[in-house]
Amino acid sequence: MDTSSAAGSGAGTGDVCPCSTVATSTTSASNEQPQTKRQKIEQQIKVGSKALPPQPPHPPDILDLDANSNSHLCSSLSSSSSHSLSTPSTANNSPTTTPCSSRAASYAQLLHNILPQNGDTDLHSQPESAHDEVDRAAKLPNLLTLDTTNGNGSHASSRSNCLQATTATSIDDMLEFEQSLTRQCLCGVSERTLRKPFQSHYSQDTNGQKRIAYLREWPTNKLLQFLSNLQLLFDIYLKQNAKGFICTRIMDVCDALIRNDHKLIDEIIVLAGYENSYVQFLAGRVLAAFLVIAKQELNDEWLQKIVDQLFNFEQLDQAAVQKIHFSLDIIKRIVEWKDMEIHPLDDDWMASANSTSAASSVVPLSTEASVSYMHFPVQEQPLATNYFALQFREDTEGERETGQEAPDNRDRHRRHFGEDMNVAYEPHPAPQSTTMPSGCHVVTLTDSESFDTTHLKCITIQKLEHKWPTLVKNMSELMAPTHQDAAEHCVLNFLQLWENIISVKANLSIDETRPYYAQLDKFELLLSHSLSCTVYKQMLCLFNEALCYGSTLALQDMLPEETCKLAHQIVCHVRGFRILESLPRRQPDNMVSLIGYNGKPMVYANGTITLAHAAQSGDSEEDGAPLDLIEMDKTLLQKMVLLVLKSIAVTVKEIRSDSSDSSIDSTDYDAFQDMMLIERSIRDVLSKLETFIKQTLEFHPECHFSKILIHLFDDQDDHLIEAMVCTLDVTSGISFRNNAFPELVAMLNPVYTFLEFLKMTSNSSDLLLDLLVSNETCFLLYLLRLLKYIRMNWTMFVHSCHTFGMGSAMLDEAMGVLIRLRLQISRLVSRQLYPYDISPVLRLLESCESLYEGNELS
């Protein structure tokens, strides 16, 4: 029984069950002359239209698949305020000028009845769509045996049975829809099943008339289910879009969502003020995914409304914080959106996939294989055309099989990528449609613009740029102790957004991100021990990203002024102990260490969960003993030390770039005196940092700074390598003139740091090779500069090896690791297996090896 159709026919009859409605009309006509089924249906329509105002012809499904009887698309740009269904005509009403044979024709009325249009509560229906719906409802009198003489009991029983059947069918349809999306294909889903997840909700106005409710008026459970379905659909679309293969039906549904003008996005934006936190979370995810999918077809008003919510409030109360958090989460997800890239380790798999692609399109697969096949492989990225999609070679038989469907796919692809925006269409990047063994029709995208979100990121950043100082000021107020607990989630979202904007991974230009560096030095003043550990940690992440030394600043000749200003301020605050003392500390609770249990025993009364009186009284007497223990989070300490080292390295690099100016003589006495003052200041900062780390982590007072550094970052490879680059650059930058300032060189000594690193890795050349191949650290930059330093200061390197090992053969061990590394790299290069040009490192390794073999001191 088509219960969804039955429900649709009775939607306009108030709260009466569709089954009982049909039964009543049948009883009223029993005393008349015999009539055909069509006459009975028309009689029922006339009676219903006289008794009630016009109502929707069926439940307000978002996917209104039945009204499009002539396969004509409804205009989504020129519809009136009533938004009535388009009448069948010979003209095509679609702004996309899609032929009526298009696959998307059945989704033309997407979102037509989901929401009230422009405040109208009266809905108008078309006779054609009503006839179509009643045709299906006409089956009910023959399928249901209804006795109208049984009174209210029979009426209630039939209504209950109908509701139970409708509920069971809806659950089954919902389960089928979700399982199909899990398999990443909607090709086998019926139209009725596709409607169920997107059904709207009715409410009554002040006059007692039924109308389609706004999203904010929906029940929480139904709203959560609706938003979850949208999120799941968008997530599947984005994953397939990133890989270059999209199920045609998923593509059509998302395309219809993008082209609707029924205020759905505006209604979801209004959910920022919804009381349920789960609804807010889902609404933010849906909006972010929708904006990423829309891209060039983006409505500028959507982004503007999201940005305006950051500032449209009279006071920073809980409601304002909630809306700010909602908008920040959407903008953050847009900025941090990363296009999927192929992993270097997947090259072998891709090669085998390419060699067997033709065979895999013919050989039938099992059920499990067909499901896993829908998780399409990531396509390679040819550099010549900048396309992100891989052009698969199809055999002649495959081309013949898919030849009839190709024109339709080209029309579909052309409509999806900008024909509404009057963009000139080139036939070269047309999608290719293939039928998978599981029965899914897949479109292969070859348009690089379909994968690029740079335009969306730039628009978002530009809209936020001029209002950024105001937002920073508001966030500074929320970080006050009075607001900190209630607004911590909002502050964390803001800090993460700021970090993502200035991050190198965002692929934004320097001019676009420069305004976001201007407020960093003022924001650094907010570092305080009163902040929570999570907020403090995120602030350190923000400043470390601004001073991205290993990935960016170390490779630049001229450093940005805003970055240098932030580095100078941090160095000054370290000298005054302000920033180091601002690290939040906490007292350990029931901490178990190597020397035993440091917490207080908790004694409970027998059979209860309340503390015994003896334990409570004992607590008050022994409060002073364990409270002397102060614990500091190691992650916070790591980020703070790395931030200080980066600031020192940036300061030294800026000084060296200024002093290397051709207008300054290398023997200038005043310049040398300035360098002495700077070196003394840097040495003072490093001494205070070293003392602070030793006191916090309980190192021996005579322990060298290099050992402290290696063991502090022993669980963070990226932080460790970047810290080693900083110490190496500070040493070589300060002492670049005739090995001046030996005190600073002895304090940092990059050779000690390298030897301590080899000791920690057990002299493994394999690990060094892994770090060279990986792009997760800046080890290539470190090794290149270290080898140059060793070659220029060979005597100092040999002497440091002897003093570090206390007479042991540290020189032989260190050079043995470097020689083995050179041999491993040479073998990979000879087989053309190395991923990039490593010849500069090979030449430096050979140069150091020749010095080692000809060195008399070794």
Swiss-Prot record:
The keyword Transcription applies. GO terms for cellular component: cytoplasm; nucleus. This is Protein lines. GO terms for biological process: embryonic foregut morphogenesis; embryonic hindgut morphogenesis; embryonic pattern specification; epidermis development; foregut morphogenesis; hindgut morphogenesis; positive regulation of transcription by RNA polymerase II; proximal/distal axis specification. InterPro entries: Lines_C, LINES_N, Protein_Lines. The keyword Nucleus applies. Signal peptide: none annotated. Residues 1-102 are annotated as: Disordered. Residues 20-30, 65-102 have a biased composition (Low complexity). It comes from the Eukaryota.
